[in-house]
Amino acid sequence: MRAAVLGLCTAVVLVSRVADAQMPLPAAKPPDGATLFKQQCAVCHTTNLSEPMRQGPPLVKIVGRTAGKVEGFHYSDGLAKADFAWDETRLDAWLTNPQAVIPGVVMAYRQAKPETRAAIITYLKELN
């Protein structure tokens, strides 16, 4: 009888371990735009006009701003001559491939994932 009880307890423990192993993990929450900006953009760009300029211009209030026109930043010739204002569509194209928007620009960053670009653009809009 003792062996039967011990065997039953062992079986219950093993079955519960198998059930635990088959439980799905909760879905990971994708990073938000602020986190993605810090990870992928903040090396070159600030979000504050009072901070020193970095390799790229500050991006605070970029949505609606005329491209290539932050005072004190030295833009490439192509970007300095740009005649458009930044909007969601233009920012999405820019983050996908800056060279396709304005050939000859210095920015090397490219983001292939639409959801990552959308999160970064949403964050930039919040800075307006």
Go through each PLM region and give its residues.
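Electrostatic cytochrome c docking/interface patches
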Residues: 19-38, 51-52
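Short Fe-S-cluster ligation motifs
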Residues: 69-89
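Bacterial N-terminal signal peptides that target proteins for export
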Residues: 1-8
